[in-house]
Regions:
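Nucleotidyltransferase catalytic core that binds NTPs
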Residues: 1-162
Length: 162
């Protein structure tokens, strides 16, 4: 698995990029389902499975007083993601400027222009961009505009818990 640090270091084009996005702290079962779904689609299409994540934890920038202790440190998180057959991790520097991006700007500048995403895999409660303005319906709208498909993974239950 290749790890790319910083969005300025993304060097495509990539064969049929299938991307899942999130902080992924803890790399819990729900995250693993997203990674495996992205890897499965990429394998079927002869593409590249990607996880797009952030360093540091977004709350460290947005609301430092609310940042939880990390469940998984960076190197362990990378090991767990790799175990789910992800080909490439893009780790964005989560800065105030990054946090302030509007969802459309992120969709165009990063997802479309830099990565060339073809399919996205997100959880049912996913939101992105400034103030989490980018909802799943909005992401689907961006997919229509920029030419990518969005797969929404429904909640996973284990022992009756979501």
């Amino acid at each position: 698995m290749k790890i790319v640090r910083g969005t300025k270091n993304i060097s495509g084009p990539f064969p049929y990029p299938v991307v899942t996005l999130g902080n992924f702290d803890g790399v819990h079962v729900g995250h693993q389902i997203l990674f495996r779904k992205a890897a499965e689609i990429a394998l079927e299409k002869g593409g590249t499975s990607m996880a797009f994540t952030f360093e540091p934890h977004p709350l460290k920038i947005i609301a430092p007083e609310k940042v939880p202790p990390l469940l998984t440190h960076f190197h362990k998180k990378m090991e767990l993601i790799e175990a789910c057959n992800i080909d490439r991790v893009i780790c964005a520097d989560f800065t105030r400027q990054f946090a302030d991006q509007r969802p459309r700007d992120f969709s165009k500048n990063i997802l479309s222009d830099k990565i060339g995403v073809k399919e996205m895999v997100v959880g049912f409660d996913y939101a992105f961009g400034r103030g989490r303005e980018g909802t799943i319906p909005y992401l689907k709208k961006m997919g229509e505009e920029f030419g990518f498909m969005v797969h929404v993974v429904e909640p996973f239950q284990l022992d009756g818990l979501t």
